[in-house]
Amino acid sequence: MSQEPPARPDPATLSYEQARAELVDVVQRLEQGAATLEDSLALWERGEALAARCQEWLDGARDRLARVSPASGGATEAPAPAERDR
């Protein structure tokens, strides 16, 4: 019998902060090692979905920053501190 709540929101509907907070909880629960194999697999699957949602948000934020920062020449990464200080 699973210990997961029966009605969890679809990860696609979660904000970055909501998905990340739940992902942190999932990881902590898995690290405790107290769940059954079935529950652990369900937690793992939920964690994968939450991690994918977080990555979608991060990719979208990176794209958005690249669009509004024409001075960067479309670069999506800042120069390393050593290169910036030259």
Swiss-Prot record:
Q: Does the keyword Hydrolase apply?
A: yes
Q: Signal peptide position in this chain?
A: none
Enzyme class comes to hydrolase
Query: What are the GO BP annotations of this UniProt entry?
Result: DNA catabolic process
Q: Which GO molecular function entries does the Swiss-Prot or TrEMBL record give?
A: exodeoxyribonuclease VII activity
Instruction: Supply the alphabetized keyword list.
Output: Cytoplasm, Exonuclease, Hydrolase, Nuclease
| EC annotation from Swiss-Prot or TrEMBL | 3.1.11.6
Annotated compartments: Cytoplasm
Query: What's the catalysed reaction?
Result: Exonucleolytic cleavage in either 5'- to 3'- or 3'- to 5'-direction to yield nucleoside 5'-phosphates
Which superkingdom does the taxonomy of this entry point to? Answer: Bacteria
User: Could you state one GO cellular component term attached to this entry?
Assistant: cytosol
Spans annotated as Disordered: 67-86
Q: Does the keyword Phosphoprotein apply?
A: no
One Pfam family here? Exonuc_VII_S
Describe the function of this protein: Bidirectionally degrades single-stranded DNA into large acid-insoluble oligonucleotides, which are then degraded further into small acid-soluble oligonucleotides.
Q: Which family does it belong to?
A: Belongs to the XseB family.
Q: How does it assemble?
A: Heterooligomer composed of large and small subunits.
Q: What is this protein called?
A: Exodeoxyribonuclease 7 small subunit
